[in-house]
Amino acid sequence: MITLLVVAGIALLIAIGYMNHVVENNKLEKARTKIELNDRLRRCGELTETFPGQLMTPALKLLITRLEINVCQRLLNLEKTNTAVKARLDELNALAAQGESIPVNNPPAPIQTEAKAKDVRFLLEALHGQITRAAQDGFLPPNEAKRWIREVRHILVLLHIEFFNNLGQHALQQEQPGQARLAFERGVQYLRKQQEPQVYAEQLDYLEKLLARANAMVLASTQPVE
C-alpha cells in the first residue's frame, strides 16, 4: 500500500512538473508571438507612412493595409482588450472597404542618393517579408502572394531606373559629363541584366540615349583646342 502511495505521489509530482513546463512554454510562445507581431505591425506602419509616393499605387496601398489588418487581427487574438489595436483595426477596415479607391497620400520622395536608394530597398525587403509571412499565415492565397512578390521585384527595378537617371541628370546639371556617363552606364547595364529585359525596353532605350549624349560630351571635352 505504501509503495503504491509512493508511486502515485511520484507520478503526481511528475504530472505537476510536466504541466508547469507546458504552461511556461505556452507563456514563452505567447510572449514571442506578441513581440513578432508588434515588430510586423511596426514594419507595416513604416511601409504605409514612408514608402515613396511615386512608387506607391492604390493597389499596393490596399495590399499594405490588408497586411496590417492581418497582423492586427492576430495581435487582437492575443490581447483581446487592447483598445489601441482595436481602434487601428477599425480604421484599417474602413480604408480597405474603399478597394482601389483607397487614398494614397504618400508624398513623392526623389531617389537622388545611394543612401535614399538603400532606404527604399530596405522598405521593399520589409514588404517582401510581410507578403511571405501573410502567405504562411494563410491570409494571402499563394497565387496572390507570388504575384505581389513579382511586383516587388518590378518596383525594385523602377527604383534603380529612377536612381541612375536622377544621378546622371544631376551630374549633367553640374557639368560633370564623366560622372553622368558612369551613372547612365550603370543603369543600362542593370536593365540589360534583368531576366525579362524586354519589359523595360522603353526605359533602356531612354537611358542608352542619355548615355550616348553624355559620352559625346566627354569626347568633346577631351578634344584638343586648335
Give the residues covered by each predicted segment:
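Repeat-mediated protein-protein interaction surfaces in helical alpha-solenoids
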Residues: 13-14, 129-153
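Alpha-helical junction/boundary sensor with strong preference for TPR arrays
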Residues: 71-75, 131, 138, 191-194, ...
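Long, non-transmembrane cytosolic or organellar matrix-exposed soluble domains/tails
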Residues: 161-226
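TPR-adjacent "capping" and linker segments in tetratricopeptide-repeat scaffold/adaptor proteins
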Residues: 28-31, 35, 144-163
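Residues that mark the junctions of alpha-helical repeat units in TPR/alpha-solenoid scaffolds
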Residues: 36, 40, 64, 153-156, ...
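Alpha-helical linker/edge segments of TPR/alpha-solenoid repeat scaffolds
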Residues: 78-82, 95-107, 138-140, 206-226
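Membrane-proximal, non-transmembrane interface segments of integral membrane proteins
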Residues: 43-134
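N-terminal signal-anchor transmembrane alpha helix of single-pass membrane proteins
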Residues: 1-37
